Amino acid sequence: MAEDGLPKIYSHPPTESSKTPTAATIFFGADNAIPKSETTITSEGDHVTSVNEYVLESDFSTTADNKLTPTKEKLRSEDDMGTDFIKSTTHLQKEITSLTGTANSITRDSITENFMTVKIGNISSPVTTVSLIDFSTDIAKEDILLDTIDTGDAEILITSEVSGTLKDSSAGVADTPAFPRIKDEADMNNYNSSIKSNVPADEAIQVTDSIIPEAEIPPAPEVNFTTIPDITALEEEKMTKIDLSVLEDDTSAVATLTDSDEEKFITVFELTTSAEKDKDNQEDTLLTDEESPEGANMWMERETATEAETHSVLLTAVESRYDFVVPASIATNLVEDSSTEEELSETDRTETVPKITEPFSGTSSVLDTPDYKEDTSTTETDIFELLKEEPDEFMI
C-alpha cells in the first residue's frame, strides 16, 4: 500500500522468479522480444488449464524456471518420452493441403496443429507433460464388451439350444449372440458350456450354447402357451355377462318390469282415470244449480273432471278399483242442503232433497267444524251404501 492509502501500481508484471516452479511461460515475438500479449500455460498435475492462441514459426522459445531450452532439443526430449507433440507450422503465404486434397490458401494467419498420442500405462510426467488416457495393461480378452466389437454390415443372429431332461415343465434357455468371424481374429463363438444346478442326478438339466442354423431351432415348449387361450376365453365370457342391456325392442324385459311394478301401475291408472269413473257414477256427485228458476237440485256433470282429480282419495292397489271417492263438492252441498231443506219446508216444495241427504246426516255435523279432515274410516259405511255394495265382501 502507498502512503496515501492507494494501492501500488506496477509498470510491468513481476519477474519470472516470483512465479511457481510448476508454471511455464511461453513468449511470442521476433528475436525473443516480449509481445503485447502473452499466454501462460499452467500444469496442474496432468491437466492443461490454458492453451496458447498464436505460435509463430522460428520464434518459439520456452522459459521454465528461468531456463531457456532450444525448440529442437525440447521436441526431441518429448519425442523420447512419448508425450504430446505441438507442431507449429505457420507462414504468411503458405498453402496447406487438407485430407481431402483441397488446397486452402491462408494468408496472414497462424495455424497450430496439435498431434496427441495415447500412452498406455501410468506416466510420471514432468511439469509440462499431460497424460490423457490411462489403460490397464492387464486387460483380458474376455473382459472386452460385446458392444465395442465392430461387426460391419453383418447381421447378428441370436440362437439358442436346449438339451437335457425336461421335467415338471421347467427348463433354462440361454441366448447367445452369434457374431460373424473377423479376419485374423480367433472365433470366440465356437465354445460349449454346460451348467448344472444343485438338484438330484435324475433331474439335472444341461444347457448348451452353440451356433445352429435357424431351421433347426426347436419350438418353444407348448406348456408355456397353454394358458393363453384359456385367459382369452375367460375374458370373452366376462364380456358377454357384463355387456347386458335392456333393449327397447325386447318385449320380454318390458313385460317383466311391468309384472314387478304392477301395483304401482294400477295405482297410477286409477289416479288418471278416476275422473272418467266419476262420470259413469253420476250418483256420487250432487250439485245445486243456483241459476235454476225453480231453485231445485239437479244432477249435473259440469266440472266433474277437475273436482275428481283434485279431491280424490286413493287407497291400496286392490281397493282402488272400487274408487272410494269423497269429493269436496259433496261437503259443500251438504251444508247448502241443510239450508235449502228449511227453505223448501216453508215454500212447500218437493221433499226429494231430504231423502237424498239423509244418509249423510252423520257427516254433516262433522263437516261444519273448520278443522275438519277427511277420514274414510268414519264415512266408510255411507260410501258403500252410496255405491250400493256390501263392504264385507270387498274388504281385505
Swiss-Prot record:
UniProt GO cellular component terms: acrosomal vesicle; mitochondrial inner membrane; motile cilium; sperm principal piece
GO terms classed as biological process: flagellated sperm motility; spermatogenesis
Residues modified as Phosphoserine: 274, 320, 377
Mitochondrion as UniProt keyword: yes
Pfam families: CABS1
Cited InterPro entries: Ca-bd_spermatid
Name used for this protein in its record: Calcium-binding and spermatid-specific protein 1
Species the sequence originates in: Macaca fascicularis (Crab-eating macaque)
Gene: CABS1
